[in-house]
Amino acid sequence: MEAITYTFILFLTLGLLFFAVAFRETPRIQKK
């Protein structure tokens, strides 16, 4: 059970980081 919990936390953190980078870089890409 511990492995599943750690994997879930890892994916959650990676997802949050990915969203943060996407939201920060999206305005720069759309701004032409």
Curated annotation (Swiss-Prot):
This is Photosystem II reaction center protein T. It is a single-pass membrane protein. PSII is composed of 1 copy each of membrane proteins PsbA, PsbB, PsbC, PsbD, PsbE, PsbF, PsbH, PsbI, PsbJ, PsbK, PsbL, PsbM, PsbT, PsbX, PsbY, PsbZ, Psb30/Ycf12, peripheral proteins PsbO, CyanoQ (PsbQ), PsbU, PsbV and a large number of cofactors. It forms dimeric complexes. One of its GO terms (biological process) is photosynthesis. Signal peptide: none annotated. The chain crosses the membrane at residues 3-23. It is found in: Cellular thylakoid membrane. Keywords: Membrane, Photosynthesis, Photosystem II, Thylakoid, Transmembrane, Transmembrane helix. The gene is psbT. Belongs to the PsbT family. GO terms for cellular component: photosystem II reaction center; plasma membrane-derived thylakoid membrane. Pfam families: PsbT. InterPro entries: PSII_PsbT, PSII_PsbT_sf. Found at the monomer-monomer interface of the photosystem II (PS II) dimer, plays a role in assembly and dimerization of PSII. PSII is a light-driven water plastoquinone oxidoreductase, using light energy to abstract electrons from H(2)O, generating a proton gradient subsequently used for ATP formation.
